[in-house]
């Protein structure tokens, strides 16, 4: 299986399955001398880990990360950083009844046709369990970016039919939904409680924002910053769409509304989401991602078995009724990985570039 590595100068390679003994990652390209300890990684892993509320899977994983290499006396050495998270709460017997069946809207059918063999236990490699390593690697990127004044934060902007207006970052970490409007939390909880009674699942929309990004990151033509962000965010399990800035809303906008006019005091808007011509403009980088409803639900669904016979599938096991609830730290991680990769690439080619034009203030 190829496609397990992301990035060019700052690279992340992951391995491991949902019900295997462990998940691992190799992070290459981290600059030396960065102060780094386990808590830097564990902080974000705890935000993503399962079993933290009644609205997520009840699989209990501590997700305690181990740093195997690349850090000495509390600082990165420039060598590859090896990371490991042990799986401790697998219940593979929950999946024995569907080992010869294909769950609708899941990767079972496509993995079977591509590889001729699949790990049916919890989805194997296709499980979102893999994203724990992305979060750990992304935490390293976030730590370095912070030394450059770059801060990445995300929040839930929609759950099912419920639109969530942004009010304050202060409430995002105070609830299970990463909700920026504390007044919306009771409505979200009631919706999820009913969803669980209905034995169903629902999608969500996540917004992730990077502030403090300098102008100049991005490598046209094929490595545009927005293209690589879309690639990174689309690679997250269950993501079916990515928007940068105004996104698809630009279709209904006129040029006079969409263009981000400039004054000596700064930009007057940020419809572009902080990226112009594939290069960061110095404005906040804003991305939105849409996640589909969880495929694995207990409501019976029509499918086939490996011999092509009709079958009804009832998925047991422990699953998130809304994968978007835990997706915010994953989206932050992938944005951080992309930005650090492009920061290092920009430094390698353009470190000596200097212009007299001032950097415009952010909105």
Curated annotation (Swiss-Prot):
Catalyzes what? 5-O-(1-carboxyvinyl)-3-phosphoshikimate = chorismate + phosphate
Which positions bind FMN?
Answer: 125-127, 237-238, 277, 292-296, 318
> Care to name a GO molecular-function term for this sequence?
FMN binding
One GO location term (cellular component): cytosol
For this protein, the Enzyme Commission number is 4.2.3.5
Which biological process, per GO, is one annotated for this protein?
aromatic amino acid family biosynthetic process
Tell me the superkingdom of the source.
Bacteria
| Listed SUPFAM superfamilies | Chorismate synthase, AroC
Q: Which cofactor does it need?
A: FMNH2
Q: Name one Pfam family in it.
A: Chorismate_synt
Q: Which UniProt keywords apply?
A: Amino-acid biosynthesis, Aromatic amino acid biosynthesis, FAD, Flavoprotein, FMN, Lyase, NADP
Q: Tell me the CDD domains matching this sequence.
A: Chorismate_synthase (cd07304)
Cofactor binding, note field: Reduced FMN (FMNH(2)).
Which pathway does this polypeptide act in?
Answer: Metabolic intermediate biosynthesis; chorismate biosynthesis; chorismate from D-erythrose 4-phosphate and phosphoenolpyruvate: step 7/7
Residue positions annotated to bind NADP(+) are 48, 54
Broad EC category: lyase
How it assembles, according to the record, is: Homotetramer.
**Entry-linked HAMAP family:** Chorismate_synth
Q: What does this protein do?
A: This reaction introduces a second double bond into the aromatic ring system.
| Family the UniProt entry places it in | Belongs to the chorismate synthase family.
Q: What is this protein called?
A: Chorismate synthase
Give the source lineage, highest ranks first.
Bacteria, Pseudomonadati, Pseudomonadota, Gammaproteobacteria, Pseudomonadales
